Amino acid sequence: MKKELNFWKMLKIQPDIYRIFFVFIFLIFSTNELKAEIKKPNPDIKPREVIEIQLNALMKNDTPSKDHGIIQTWFFAHPNNQRVTGPIERFKNMIKTDSYSMLLNHENYEIVEVYKSKGVSTFEVTIMDKDKKYYKFKWQVEKYELDGFLKNCWLTTAVSQPMPMGSSI
């Protein structure tokens, strides 16, 4: 009984240590939860699905955290694309420019395949942005052929500048 009292007494004496401990544990689990929400490339994901993953993420860019959609999109960018558009902070800034900002928090999209070969697929993507304006893009994905964790994964190699298509109003 005396040992049990000492334990509770110790908790009262050192509450700050325990608060710090619980905050630390909470942060660890929160960080892992955010990481778990990022979809990673794998060979089972088809070309169209790559674009759907990217567009769905950009549609809700700041959910569950700031720029989550842009980060998700980055994960499916081909390494050659990342070399040109990265690092990630530069990629975030590029997406937020007038050239691509209409992708952020857009209302809906349509994807039409226009070309397919063994290792390359090209799609015409039409989005309606949050201001009800339509834009069309050419979106190209390629199968990554080099050894490593991305082998046989479909990844985005190019997204054209948008072509304004007018308003829905």
Regions found by a protein language model. Name each.
Residues 64-119:
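Short solvent-exposed beta->alpha transition segments
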Residues 32-36:
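Sec/Tat signal peptide C-region and signal peptidase I cleavage site
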Residues 37-49:
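N-terminal low-complexity, Pro/Thr/Ser-rich intrinsically disordered segments
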Residues 46-62, 72, 76:
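Short, aromatic-enriched amphipathic alpha-helices that serve as compact interaction elements
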Residues 114-169:
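Exposed beta-sheet edge and beta->alpha loop/turn motif
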Residues 3-21:
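Bacterial N-terminal signal peptides that target proteins for export
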Residues 20-30:
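Bacterial N-terminal signal peptides
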Residues 60-66, 147-148:
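Low-complexity, polar-biased intrinsically disordered regions enriched in Pro/Ser/Thr/Gly
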